[in-house]
Regions:
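Active-site activation/catalytic loop segments of kinase-like enzymes and analogous catalytic loops
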Residues: 410-474, 491-506
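Active-site acidic catalytic loop and adjacent metal/ATP-binding pocket
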Residues: 368-420
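N-terminal nucleotide-binding beta1-loop-alpha1 segment
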Residues: 1-21
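Conserved kinase catalytic-core helix
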Residues: 288-338, 351, 363-377, 491
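Conserved alpha/beta core of the MobA/IspD/sugar-nucleotide pyrophosphorylase nucleotidyltransferase superfamily
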Residues: 2-6, 96, 153-229
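Conserved core of the sugar-phosphate nucleotidyltransferase
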Residues: 108-186
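Conserved beta-loop-beta/alpha segment of the NTase-like Rossmann-fold superfamily
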Residues: 61-137
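ATP-binding glycine-rich loop module of kinase domains
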Residues: 220-250, 285-292
Length: 527
């Protein structure tokens, strides 16, 4: 039995950034932490996940857990660690005749230690109230009720394996359901060995969460990304793209630099261009939007900061004769080109009829309807980010301010520029909020396309409806764009991105289907 113990909610600091969720549901690498934890379970061992009884698991998370044969155990709220463990084991109905693996819900490892009757240990890195390893045979493990003053102590870090789980339950029960006291009793009865852990990552506190997340990202970073505790360096074989991003950061007006990480310069080494930014211990909005449970009023503050940035973009004077990204280049021209490419690859035509939600519609009609509602009139020219979507926006909860990364910095024909029509950035922001792009990228959808009939379900949670409506009103008040404008621009974006997702047919199908979903919303706005 492999039990992931996530039967309590995250602490107050983490709750302020991610909402009231169990630790195993925290975001990590655009997935939930439990998806990484389940992968640690030895092959052939049944996996269980304990959760607070009051926590409502979303349908899509339920489906993932069922698909990976993970059994949820709902334990009463407010139990101590020891009582929660005993409750989980009793509720599970497990025979307790086979070895028991226990993993804390806020913990991850590169790999699990090997052995029977073991306690995984690490050296303390931070000053928290850890349980420490001692030389005392009676109290082999001790709870430290005050922050530790030095770093040399070994602490238990969240993985255990017991050969006699029934004896463990007896020991914890006899210790008045105190987990550490129960472990000491088991140590005297059966014996436990301390084993050094391999790649321990702790997500239980806000500081350790961000440090562990940085370490996790570093371990899985592409060759083109170098991450240290202080900076991140980006490079690519696509030199022109990196040079354009560096140009944007290098030339950004001083008034706007509060909205980016500190820019640390670029270099050209043996023909390979790279640049560095300060590494920020913050979460990107795509992970917050999909995986957190933040109330609508927090989202309104986040979006207000994003709009503040875009308003500041609009205030910047455009240099005479500078290349400019115009709306027609970024939408109509690019959409037509990319859509033709997609149709050719799929062996379909723009005039083919598709059925979605009981209506027959062609791609050509969707393009025409969206074209009709694209913003017209005077361009909103200023500094253009060019890819202002949730995955490129970080949020600092302490400062109530966004930080943005990965700008475009050039025109479609390759000219470096800071400038463009910021309505394109509004479209990119909309395609995250209204278009639910990040839910699709995270795999939180169901799509079926057969005989030109399209079915799409995105697992978006209902509490985002208020956030979406607030966003539409905020954009209309600030920039004069209507809901129709926003949906029309998104449709163009989703159609134009289709060839870029050819590496994943199912995801490409979902993005394709989403254009039909957005088109239906656009039609309803017209009625």
């Amino acid at each position: 039995m492999f039990l992931i113990m996530s039967g309590a909610y995250v602490g107050q600091e983490l709750e302020s950034e991610f909402g009231r969720i169990p630790p195993s549901f925290l975001p990590l690498g655009n997935r939930r932490l439990f998806q990484h934890q389940v992968a640690l379970a030895p092959q052939g061992v049944k996996v269980y996940l304990s959760l607070p009884e009051s926590y409502a698991v979303s349908e899509i998370d339920h489906q993932w857990l069922e698909h990976h044969q993970v059994t949820i155990i709902a334990t009463p709220d407010g139990l101590s660690l020891g009582a929660s463990l005993v409750a989980a084991l009793n509720i599970s109905g497990h025979s307790l005749n086979a070895p028991l693996h226990i993993l804390y819900g806020d913990t991850l490892f590169n790999q699990l230690p090997v052995g029977d009757d073991i306690v995984s240990v690490s050296t303390a890195k931070d000053s928290y109230n850890w349980a420490v390893l001692t030389n005392d045979e009676v109290d082999w493990l001790q709870d430290v009720n005050t922050p530790m003053s030095h770093e040399s102590q070994r602490i238990i870090d969240g993985y255990f394996k017991f050969s006699r789980p029934r004896e463990l339950v007896r020991c914890i029960t006899q210790s008045e359901w105190k987990f550490i006291a129960g472990l000491n009793r088991y140590h005297k009865s059966v014996g436990l060995s301390a084993v050094n852990s391999i790649g321990w990552l702790d997500f239980g506190h806000v500081n350790t969460y961000y440090h562990s997340k940085a370490e996790f990202t570093t371990q899985r970073a592409f060759n083109e990304l170098t991450i240290t505790a202080k900076w991140i360096e980006k490079s690519s074989i696509k030199n022109q793209k990196i040079a354009a991003e560096a140009y944007w950061f290098d030339n950004l007006p001083m008034a706007m630099r509060g909205f980016i990480p500190q820019y640390l310069g670029s270099q050209n080494s043996e023909g390979k261009i790279s640049y560095r930014l300060e590494y920020l211990y913050l979460t990107a909005l795509n992970e917050l939007f999909v995986f957190s449970r933040l109330p609508s009023q927090i989202w309104q503050k986040i979006l207000a900061s994003a709009v503040e940035f875009l308003s500041l973009c609009l205030e910047q004077a455009v240099e005479p004769n500078a290349p400019i990204n115009t709306l027609d280049i970024l939408f109509s021209d690019k959409t037509a080109l990319r859509l033709n490419e997609f149709c050719a690859a799929r062996h379909i035509t723009l005039e083919d009829q598709w059925q979605f939600a009981g209506q027959d519609i062609s791609l050509a009609q969707i393009v025409r309807d969206s074209q009709k509602h694209l913003p017209d009139g005077k361009p909103l020219l200023g500094v253009l980010h060019g890819d202002f979507c949730f995955s490129n926006i970080l949020y600092d909860f302490r400062a109530n301010k966004i930080k943005t990364i990965d700008p475009r910095g050039m025109t479609p024909d390759g000219q470096k520029t800071l400038y463009g029509d910021i309505r394109y950035d509004l479209a990119k922001l909309s395609h995250s909020i209204l278009g639910l792009y990040d839910w699709i990228i995270a795999g939180y959808y169901h799509v079926e396309i057969a005989n030109n009939a399209i079915e799409l379900k995105i697992a978006e949670q209902s509490h985002h409806k208020e956030t979406q409506q607030g966003f539409i009103e905020l954009i209309e008040q600030t920039f004069g764009l209507t809901a129709k404008n926003l949906y029309a621009m998104q449709i163009q974006l989703f159609l134009s991105m289709l060839p870029l997702h050819a590496d994943d047919r199912r995801r490409q199908d979902a993005l394709f289907a989403n254009a039909f979903r957005l088109h239906q919303i656009l039609l309803r706005l017209d009625q």
